[in-house]
Amino acid sequence: MGEKAIDEDKVEAMKSSKTSLVFAINGQRFELELSSIDPSTTLVDFLRNKTPFKSVKLGCGEGGCGACVVLLSKYDPLLEKVDEFTISSCLTLLCSIDGCSITTSDGLGNSRVGFHAVHERIAGFHATQCGFCTPGMSVSMFSALLNADKSHPPPRSGFSNLTAVEAEKAVSGNLCRCTGYRPLVDACKSFAADVDIEDLGFNAFCKKGENRDEVLRRLPCYDHTSSHVCTFPEFLKKEIKNDMSLHSRKYRWSSPVSVSELQGLLEVENGLSVKLVAGNTSTGYYKEEKERKYERFIDIRKIPEFTMVRSDEKGVELGACVTISKAIEVLREEKNVSVLAKIATHMEKIANRFVRNTGTIGGNIMMAQRKQFPSDLATILVAAQATVKIMTSSSSQEQFTLEEFLQQPPLDAKSLLLSLEIPSWHSAKKNGSSEDSILLFETYRAAPRPLGNALAFLNAAFSAEVTEALDGIVVNDCQLVFGAYGTKHAHRAKKVEEFLTGKVISDEVLMEAISLLKDEIVPDKGTSNPGYRSSLAVTFLFEFFGSLTKKNAKTTNGWLNGGCKEIGFDQNVESLKPEAMLSSAQQIVENQEHSPVGKGITKAGACLQASGEAVYVDDIPAPENCLYGAFIYSTMPLARIKGIRFKQNRVPEGVLGIITYKDIPKGGQNIGTNGFFTSDLLFAEEVTHCAGQIIAFLVADSQKHADIAANLVVIDYDTKDLKPPILSLEEAVENFSLFEVPPPLRGYPVGDITKGMDEAEHKILGSKISFGSQYFFYMETQTALAVPDEDNCMVVYSSTQTPEFVHQTIAGCLGVPENNVRVITRRVGGGFGGKAVKSMPVAAACALAASKMQRPVRTYVNRKTDMITTGGRHPMKVTYSVGFKSNGKITALDVEVLLDAGLTEDISPLMPKGIQGALMKYDWGALSFNVKVCKTNTVSRTALRAPGDVQGSYIGEAIIEKVASYLSVDVDEIRKVNLHTYESLRLFHSAKAGEFSEYTLPLLWDRIDEFSGFNKRRKVVEEFNASNKWRKRGISRVPAVYAVNMRSTPGRVSVLGDGSIVVEVQGIEIGQGLWTKVKQMAAYSLGLIQCGTTSDELLKKIRVIQSDTLSMVQGSMTAGSTTSEASSEAVRICCDGLVERLLPVKTALVEQTGGPVTWDSLISQAYQQSINMSVSSKYMPDSTGEYLNYGIAASEVEVNVLTGETTILRTDIIYDCGKSLNPAVDLGQIEGAFVQGLGFFMLEEFLMNSDGLVVTDSTWTYKIPTVDTIPRQFNVEILNSGQHKNRVLSSKASGEPPLLLAASVHCAVRAAVKEARKQILSWNSNKQGTDMYFELPVPATMPIVKEFCGLDVVEKYLEWKIQQRKNV
């Protein structure tokens, strides 16, 4: 092992008692008296509230997103070794880092000392957008590099030993809602020694035509041996004490160093609430633990019995405090034991890397034993026949099998789980077994994310001892363990085990075993997707015995005949697993005509975002006497509010008051939103009208205390004499609960629908489509800070897309003139529409509380509250009738949409135009379109990226698919025959269609075949499907048409005395690169004066500053994908004014000097002449401010028929961006929008309970795309279409339209499922029971896909096999 001999006296000398914590953060020493620390304080709370290191962000508070990831370095003085790994600082308790060193992203490098290569490569690969997740990403990447280079021989110069596969996994636990992950992975891969930089995506370092050496010289330097980052300072090594033993009763945190000391503490604390602490990761799942007031915290990680590791011929024993990551490492060291390797591989899919690094095996098992946690570990270790050692309250040790332990009553508080032992599996035989017996072991899990970071729908682990006989494979013994399906613990299917023991495996035997299994593995009542989970149990059993036959292919009898060929598992080498490496290609043209506009320059502030120095609202230092707020919301859909009280009628710690509608000052109004159709209430008054409606705003002395206290609030309700709430669209229609849509916003007819239907040769009547909702999942939740100012004024810092409307809302709520309010927004950590209307009540509540208490008040809304109160995308139900010719040409379409607006209108009246606009991407002949906007007792829905358009576009695809199915014609032909001609495009879209040259969709349709090899790959897909039973592929290409509107936008450009330039716009930087495009436009426009300074040099002189509603008025909103170009145009107008003022000065200087004039001398002269060097403007689009965007995507997927898992093998996108203002920024928008669309179509299930309260309210229950769920090959071409005089330098929008193209994945999945259903039909002798047309729901989650492939597909297959044999 290379460990040094350890002198026992040395060990004893290191043991010491102490009364303070000593640790380092970014090399700085911190010492805190234990008596001054609340032991429940998390590391992220300390970092953000007590240190200047704000790069650590809070994204979820559950260990599920990675925004708070930091590097922890731990020194072992006995081994003189430093271990370094990432941790989730939102779960790690501050007291547990004693003697450790913490490195944050700004500790790796920053603008003062120089950025780290990780930061610079993230920036250069265009891998940051809103930037809120980027510091955590940076630390994850750095940790991967650090550990790869520590554990391998020195890498070649400039590179790391990190492999490309490891690079992908390095960020697999970090969530990003903006980028689509591809550039982040490429940035990390750029360090890998086995990657060619030229194979990576579009970046700032690699230019066409350059040789490899030139590119490498431009890459930010990385040298693992000379890094300026000191992750563990020397002073800490000198100070560190190996053990900390605290006996004093005055401290609430203790760290015993022996079991006896621990038991003594437990005995002394008899009757008090005690929390044993190791990794503390359980609080991410059991969040009520954070609210519980423990009187004593006992850190048990320094007790040798809990951290011991033993490996010998008996097996591997692991102390209960061994982390999951350490356990994986230990099991992998047992090179010749495949069972342990399989256990380790399965364990790598538990949680994510930074949770596994601190979460312990004992903690995981105890959660299963005490709280019925759906543990993977418990299941696989029961099957591995693991045993546990327990120390009872009487100090005696007992040993049980893990299975026995899990079945016992919950372990009492004074008994301890000491260790867990996995027996040796070196021998392939058991006592008394035949010499020819083979011992087999496999583990299984089905989860929405292949690489983990998601609970399993079902997990399982099987072991079997088998022998080969003349008539087949005999099962001598087996253990079949299932878990995570709603049972209390991992469950052995003993009836199935007993039945199989002694049996020769055959179709008939397996069918009977499956029948028994379905009776035995029954999900508990209330478990989600029970049928799917039961089906998975059958699948895993089937896969296990299928894999068994592959190992014993000599058998000639029964269903084992032919081994893997017959079963069909993985027989095609092209069948890709989700772990396949990502690859990509980009085809981009950088325009030089208006340089630097048109160039793919790095996003403004990208390195600041990566290092974590970019300031978001919650990063602003708290003003003196600052208070903190948390929302109290209703859990009932329609009820009178009788009272607000706390549990046990005891005011929680730190609470200063509760603000309700009664606290609105005289002259103020109870308004929470303003600026759209009607104003929403800030607080419910006498009656709450929906679950999730805000009732009050609790104010406390810290955010932690505010959040805890808000969860302890009890609302007393009364529903007597109230009508039942309206919770469905059908109830809304039945009760005429509808909002009026203004006539200009309603759907409109195109052509004569009656005539179109009469011309049809075929009709499909009354078909239906449904859509659920979607949550924004911006990484930064809603946040605001309100600071009272003199003369009854209020300054509010708001994370908003709509500063002007926030401003108006606050003024109206406080009853003050608008000039008393100032709203400032610098940047937003992701918006997607959710920081428009929904940001207003957050800022208004802070302002109201600040006004009442005359102290600053801020809030950072916790993730659960944010998910429950913000509404999300509009659910809808669609009914359509369509008429068409035999060649597939559609002649008429009638569409009726029921739209769930929720409680208030919000932006819902705008939705019909979006739905219809995107639907009209095809020529429907004649179109009748009508939308009913329904009022329900649910939280008001609002705009979410491509609102209405994404549903409208998909409605079109669903109709096309149904027509194709009806006619038994290739769906691609139906799409093609219904594409618009330019004439029909003008008919449907009027002036928005523009000129003939602007209609590029037919070009894209043909180009995608060449770009992606679409038609050739279709044939390959057909061949694959013909030769594979259990994996089916589908491929589909889908077009999109998206209408956008330009809005008036103000701007100001000021040149300061030193020649530096300040630009101000009211467009908000939310990650879309608005500041970057604005800077490019200013540099180009000012460069037209031609005074010896290039546009690129001018670019470095420009700073875009925060939005301020008193500095610039009439700012409207940042929405609709066009704010970047509108802001750029406003700035261009300003610059033109400045150039006009400067030209006479330049001319005079040239005449005076007779030589060239520099920029600095020109500005100096202008200042001497007192020329106004600040110009304001307001861009006002003319009547041609509307235009259409075009794109097309081809996606290929592979569906696992047995589990419902979908792997996106490849996506190719071609998007017409006009003449892109910045192709690097637009590429990021295209990829990010597409991946967010993937979430809507494939992953993100938005669920409510029977009262309309959102229950998918955490990272545990709501799954956005991750790096392992995006296309394995992801290619994008940005079409550089021609000049268009009515647009800003011929550019087009890119933020929202590409999201619609994610429907190509859904359509491809439908094609794959269709092939699976055809296969089932071929096994059915009477050809009944599986319709060829089906409406695949959105999202097509794993349970949905499996259901449509057939929950009983295994049984049908076996029945068919048995019948085939009988017929022979």
UniProtKB/Swiss-Prot annotation:
Q: Which InterPro entries match?
A: 2Fe-2S-bd (IPR002888), 2Fe-2S-bd_dom_sf (IPR036884), 2Fe-2S_ferredoxin-like_sf (IPR036010), 2Fe-2S_ferredoxin-type (IPR001041), 2Fe2S_fd_BS (IPR006058), Ald_Oxase/Xan_DH_a/b (IPR000674), Ald_Oxase/Xan_DH_a/b_sf (IPR036856), Ald_Oxase/xanthine_DH-like (IPR016208)
Q: Check the record and name the PROSITE patterns matching this protein.
A: 2FE2S_FER_1, 2FE2S_FER_2, FAD_PCMH
Q: Name one GO cellular component term.
A: plastid
Q: Which GO terms describe its molecular function?
A: 2 iron, 2 sulfur cluster binding; aldehyde oxidase activity; FAD binding; indole-3-acetaldehyde oxidase activity; iron ion binding
Name which cysteines form disulfide bonds.
none
- E.C. no: 1.2.3.7
* Location (main, coarse): cytoplasm
| Biological process according to GO | abscisic acid biosynthetic process; auxin biosynthetic process
Recorded catalytic reaction(s): these are: indole-3-acetaldehyde + O2 + H2O = (indol-3-yl)acetate + H2O2 + H(+)
What UniProt keywords are attached to this protein's entry?
2Fe-2S, Abscisic acid biosynthesis, Auxin biosynthesis, Cytoplasm, FAD, Flavoprotein, Iron, Iron-sulfur, Metal-binding, Molybdenum, NAD, Oxidoreductase
Cofactor binding remark:
Binds 2 [2Fe-2S] clusters. Binds 1 Mo-molybdopterin (Mo-MPT) cofactor per subunit.
- Respond yes or no to whether keyword rRNA processing is given for this record: no
Temperature and activity = Optimum temperature is 65 degrees Celsius.
Q: Which residues form the FAD-binding PCMH-type domain?
A: 246-427
- Where does this polypeptide localize? Cytoplasm
Required co-factor(s) are: [2Fe-2S] cluster; FAD; Mo-molybdopterin
Q: Which residues form the 2Fe-2S ferredoxin-type domain?
A: 19-108
What does the record say about pH dependence? Optimum pH is 8.
Activity regulation field? Strongly inhibited by iodoacetate and potassium cyanide (KCN). Weakly inhibited by 2-mercaptoethanol, dithiothreitol (DTT), menadione, estradiol, 4'-(9-acridinylamino)methanesulfon-m-anisidine (mAMSA), allopurinol and tritonX-100. Not affected by p-chloromercuribenzoate.
Name the organs or tissues of expression. Answer: Predominantly expressed in roots, seedlings, mature siliques and seeds, and to lower extent in stems and rosettes. In seedlings, mostly expressed in lower part of hypocotyls and roots.
Which sites bind [2Fe-2S] cluster? 60, 65, 68
Oligomer and partners: Aldehyde oxidases (AO) are homodimers and heterodimers of AO subunits. AO-alpha is an AAO1 homodimer; AO-beta is an AAO1-AAO2 heterodimer.
Function as written in the Swiss-Prot or TrEMBL entry = In higher plants aldehyde oxidases (AO) appear to be homo- and heterodimeric assemblies of AO subunits with probably different physiological functions. AO-alpha may be involved in the biosynthesis of auxin, and in biosynthesis of abscisic acid (ABA) in seeds. In vitro, AO-alpha uses heptaldehyde, protocatechualdehyde, benzaldehyde, indole-3-aldehyde (IAld), indole-3-acetaldehyde (IAAld), cinnamaldehyde and citral as substrates; AO-beta uses IAAld, IAld and naphtaldehyde as substrates.
Hey, which family's this protein in? Answer: Belongs to the xanthine dehydrogenase family.
Q: What is this protein called?
A: Indole-3-acetaldehyde oxidase
Species of the source:
Arabidopsis thaliana
Which gene carries the instructions for this protein? Answer: AAO1
